């Protein structure tokens, strides 16, 4: 319940720009968010595994 309230609060534009911070678009996680994709590392990994992120594949060497 608290996370939903935070996501709702985050969706509005803040009074001051410095108060804005990145959150995952899918789960709302505030840490480890990849700015280029707008998702956290966990959701990014799931999306990459499913093949939903074009041009991204697992590294292997």
UniProtKB/Swiss-Prot annotation:
Zn(2+) binds at residues 24, 27, 40, 43. The keyword DNA damage does not apply. Binds 1 zinc ion per subunit. It comes from the Bacteria. The keyword Cell membrane does not apply. GO terms for molecular function: rRNA binding; structural constituent of ribosome; zinc ion binding. GO terms for biological process: translation. Pfam families: Ribosomal_S14. InterPro entries: Ribosomal_uS14 (IPR001209), Ribosomal_uS14_bact (IPR023053), Ribosomal_uS14_sf (IPR043140). Keywords: Metal-binding, Ribonucleoprotein, Ribosomal protein, RNA-binding, rRNA-binding, Zinc. GO terms for cellular component: cytoplasm; small ribosomal subunit. Its cofactor is Zn(2+). PANTHER family: 30S RIBOSOMAL PROTEIN S14 (PTHR19836), SMALL RIBOSOMAL SUBUNIT PROTEIN US14M (PTHR19836:SF19). Part of the 30S ribosomal subunit. Contacts proteins S3 and S10. Binds 16S rRNA, required for the assembly of 30S particles and may also be responsible for determining the conformation of the 16S rRNA at the A site. Belongs to the universal ribosomal protein uS14 family. Zinc-binding uS14 subfamily. NCBIfam families: PRK08061.1. This is Small ribosomal subunit protein uS14.
């Amino acid at each position: 319940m608290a996370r939903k309230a935070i996501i709702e609060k985050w969706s509005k534009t803040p009074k001051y720009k410095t108060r804005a911070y990145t959150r995952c678009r899918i789960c709302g996680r505030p840490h480890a968010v990849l700015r280029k994709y707008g998702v956290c590392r966990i959701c990014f990994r799931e999306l990459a595994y499913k093949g939903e992120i074009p041009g991204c594949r697992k590294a292997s060497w």
